[in-house]
Amino acid sequence: MTKFNQLQTKDDFAKLLGLKSAKYINYLLYNIKTDNLYNSFTIPKKNGGERVIHAPKKELKFLQKKLSNVLWECYLESIESKSKDKNFKTPVLSHAFEKGKSIITNSQMHRNKKYILNIDLKNFFDSFNFGRVRGFFIKDRDFAVSPEIATVIAQIACYQGKLPQGAPSSPIITNLITRILDYRIVKIAKKYRFTYSRYADDLTFSTNRELNSNKLRASKELENFLTELEDLIISSGFEINPKKTRLSNNMQRQEVTGLVVNKKINVKREYVKNTRAMAFRLYKDGAFEIDKTPGTINQLTGRFAFIFQIEQYNNYLLYKKSLMQNNLDSQKYLLGRNSSRKSESKYYWKYIFYNKDLQKELLHNTKHHTYNLPTEFYSIGKEEKKTYMSLFNSREKEYKKFLFYKYFFGNDKPIIVTEGKTDPRYIKAALKNLYQKYPELIEKEGNNFIFKIEFLNRSNTIEYLFNVPEGGEGFKFWYNYFSDKFYYNEKKRKKIFCTKFRRKNFIHKLHYLFQTINQ
């Protein structure tokens, strides 16, 4: 039994959302009307066309967030109660809009398979109309609310009679309603030995079975599977988009939710090349385009971060494999850039091993008949390493170069690098108290403060890519990235990438900052 099963009145429902009474809900639903509380706009789709987004205004968004949080609690409570039943195993089927799940976890299930079948549900959010949402909360045993409360929930969640794409309550409601569809589909998938997962409206099936059309039996089984699947989807109130239905084998490029999954999870090569080309144009001309429209540095940051996220995931898998095998042949590839994955340990890029660097007779483990690396390999320590940049692959190097440009060359405001991570917090607090004395650094408009400077956010990504320690020693590291004497490859005498950027822009901002502080 969940909290929703115990609701009797609107006031009970309001208290469940954290409100004192139902007055605020009634005011939005019947005085203002929820259909008047949306801003609509369009965004371009990847494959052409436009996607309509209906974003709720803050009054309604506040209420929808409350509803979303309570529904998530009920959803997790339901899964937890079922997981205690030994006879019931909760399958991981939906990977969208849930914490700890993503397009990566969705793609991982279908990696390195012979055949992959991609199916798209047409007009996914439009399929959830007012009556369907209301009926679900009445009939579903985890909720089983009264018709009055079910109507209120549907009124809060729906716009123009259906779930809007852009409302914070829509994702969880779609997951709740499609949960029964997932369970029914997975039964059919198991019958024909397919692996199934869903990411919102993207349904993916994969198998290592032979589905060659020349083999009549396999071809007939595939036809039966598709027929049963289509009948189930249509009877559940959805429609298949035939334009996006495709079957691919392992001799072709196989994609799942935009990621390539043939051997390992990867970003499409065209996406990486286009991102690099955009960055090159930005470095050279100070501007670039995305789909023939001017791009922003934040858009490019998102593209690089997405590529980097996939690289980090693959590095993590390599690291796990190395630890599991625990032998010399696999551990020699365990570069320092993966060290942050090792429990509480920090980076240990200090030791890079190759066969020629090791004396195998000293590292032989007689008990397990393996060659283990010395314990010093796992030592925690940071030291200035001029060859550190050579540890990264080309994609990581490009992201590092871009971040350096973004923070020190392409920034609109002077940037301050502090000694510690928490220093910006105290400096900002001091500037807010002294804003009248330093109008060059901060201004106040109404109740809000506008900073004319920025602080470098020492995130895990910055720490990982730049190898800059905390404390005063970190300033020396940042200086090295601007020094003409600093090389990331001593043998080839390749200088650090800052020499490729326009240094005058940074020097001008640096002088401006020092003059302002001295005043």
Q: Where in this protein do the model-derived segments appear?
A:
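Right-hand nucleic-acid polymerase module
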Residues: 1-44, 52-77, 81-119, 124-127, ...
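Active-site catalytic microenvironments for nucleophilic, acid-base chemistry
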Residues: 70-74, 139, 180, 184, ...
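The start of beta-strands in P-loop NTPase/AAA+ ATPase cores
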Residues: 113-115, 196, 253, 414, ...
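Catalytic palm active-site di-aspartate
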Residues: 118-123, 166, 170, 192-214
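Loop-centered beta-sheet repeat module
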Residues: 153, 159-188, 196-198, 204
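Short Gly/Ser/Thr- and Asp/Glu-enriched loop/turn motifs at secondary-structure junctions
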Residues: 197-201, 243, 411
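Short, flexible/disordered intra-domain loops and linkers
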Residues: 211-223, 463-474
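Acidic, divalent-metal-binding catalytic cores of TOPRIM
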Residues: 339-340, 344-519
